[in-house]
Amino acid sequence: MTTASQPPLIMGIESSCDETGVAFVRGCELLADEVASSVDEHARFGGVVPEVASRAHLEAMTPTVRRAAERAGVRLSDVDAIAVTVGPGLAGALLVGLSAAKAYALALDKPLYGVNHLVGHVAVDQLEHGPLPKPVVALLVSGGHTSLLLVRDLATDVQLLGETVDDAAGEAYDKVARLLNLPYPGGPPIDRAARDGDGTAIHFPRGKWGDGTYDFSFSGLKTAVARWVEDAERQGRPVSVPDVAAAFQEAVADVLTRKAVDACREHGVRHLVISGGVAANSRLRALAEERCAAAGIEVRVPRPRLCTDNGAMIAALGAEVVAAGLPPSPLDMAVDTSLPVSSVLVN
Amino acid sequence: MLLLAFDTATPAVTTALCESGPDGVRVRAARTTVDARRHGELLTPQIRTVVADAGVDLEDVTHIAVGIGPGPYTGLRVGLATAHALAEALGVPCVGVATLDALAWASGRTTPFIAATDARRKEVFWARYTDAATRVGDIAVNRPADVDTAGLPVIGHGAHLYADVFGQDPEAAEPLYPTAAALGEFAVRALRDGTPLPEPRPLYLRRPDAQIPGAPKKVRQPTAAELGRSR
């Protein structure tokens, strides 16, 4: 299926949370990347409602495939292989994408690769900045995940260094936004509010700071912000939303970048990839640039559109496992809501 | 017409390949596996097996018919997502059949009855039929005790689970599940006779469970003075 002239055409399907993503990729070239999001349907609930997400995936799946194929200028019969998210994620949401992917694989008689969502977040950087150096450390920060990975090889060797023990960083953003009467999802409005604030005005706690692990904790930070706001209100002190937002954001970015740089140092790695929805955060990016520059580490952050959930990340990882010559996944594979990062490919 | 039929809206994962000919509908191959928790694992391999059993290629299929429920949502969506993608990739039309209508057709009954499947949460999805081919009114979801049976026999897994409520022998509930063979026959006949079939979209009959959150919970304990005020 691989010709000397061009790498195989991979269709990637993603449905682990609230975005239905479909993309077409050849090697490191992104041909089309279509996303249908149900985020607006979740906004009034203040978080993703699994059943709402699953229903939206079913409605959006085939139209999104059609749109992506049109945009890429390919026919489904041109596809050489299909990659799909098997996990981690929401069971009902994953199952819609996996069922569709199996049906496409069967009907088109093409191999199917069930891949890991988190590793996809790292692989997607190749579509923007070209092949990843080996090894890299990856910091994945989103509404569902906060993980540090050591990636020696995208297709075959990914190791979990640490992850959040409670809330994901993005979840903390959503909860703090709600405390401050800012809209859902909380990342962009907190980032905007923080621009006019002073990140040193309040010192919020850094969970698991200097505990000798690469794990994170954001639940205590969220509670600390809630306490501070309640105390201020009770005592009749004005609550400066920009200052609270900036100080909260400082605490998140501080602990994330510190542990990421420590991980690079310990493993002698000179490249850090930051991905996931929270990678779009301006303070996280600035502080990572600053600290990595000081430590002689190069930072790679995909553009925001590629950092959030999409089909491109899955197609990019699919291209990588196909190029590595790994065997395809069986048609009876199941979704795995807590698939470990070390399982890049399910077979 | 070579129609591929399947249903995943009950614990039965069921697939059939049906062909219409001059002397009616012929079921070329069919398979059913009952496993309420593995719809996603079972369906696509089952389709591959049924197509192979019939000695045809998937490209020979001219129509797809899928059970649209109602039924437990996660399993139900496996069938629909599969049907949508197969139809798209093969470039063939896809129609829906209410799962209860397939169950009713599978019963072959010629006198009035009620078909009921398990809706979980101690409820059933149900509808009334004058015979195997004819539903009267809409499909509903209720607690078994709230189903107005009007003394009619009740069939299906719902009747089996709540035989005591319906006041009948659990064994009288057969058939418990729809078969894709029945679903396919039902669809082929409707397509041939020009009887409209539903779009291949899910019948949920319930809204998603979700609560709009109130104000954030307070993290501080109220002081004694505050407690005194609220009394």
From Swiss-Prot, chain A:
Which Gene Ontology BP terms does the record give?
A: tRNA threonylcarbamoyladenosine modification
The record's free-text note on cofactor binding: Binds 1 Fe(2+) ion per subunit.
Q: Which UniProt keywords apply?
A: Acyltransferase, Cytoplasm, Iron, Metal-binding, Transferase, tRNA processing
What are the record's GO terms for cellular component?
cytoplasm
Q: Which cofactor does it need?
A: Fe(2+)
Query: For substrate, which residues are the binding ones?
Result: L140, V141, S142, G143, G144, D174, G187, D191, N281
What PROSITE patterns is this protein classified in? GLYCOPROTEASE (PS01016)
Cell compartments where the protein resides: Cytoplasm
Q: Which domain of life is it from?
A: Bacteria
Binding positions (Fe cation):
H117, H121, D309
Under Gene Ontology molecular function, one entry of this record is: iron ion binding
Its transmembrane ranges are: none
A Pfam family this chain is assigned to:
TsaD
CDD domains for the chain: ASKHA_NBD_TsaD_bac
Main subcellular location of this protein, as a coarse class: cytoplasm
Q: So what family is this one in?
A: Belongs to the KAE1 / TsaD family.
Extract the PANTHER family matched here.
TRNA N6-ADENOSINE THREONYLCARBAMOYLTRANSFERASE, TRNA N6-ADENOSINE THREONYLCARBAMOYLTRANSFERASE, MITOCHONDRIAL
Function, as annotated, reads: Required for the formation of a threonylcarbamoyl group on adenosine at position 37 (t(6)A37) in tRNAs that read codons beginning with adenine. Is involved in the transfer of the threonylcarbamoyl moiety of threonylcarbamoyl-AMP (TC-AMP) to the N6 group of A37, together with TsaE and TsaB. TsaD likely plays a direct catalytic role in this reaction.
* Official protein name in the record: tRNA N6-adenosine threonylcarbamoyltransferase
- Organism source for this protein? Thermobifida fusca (strain YX)
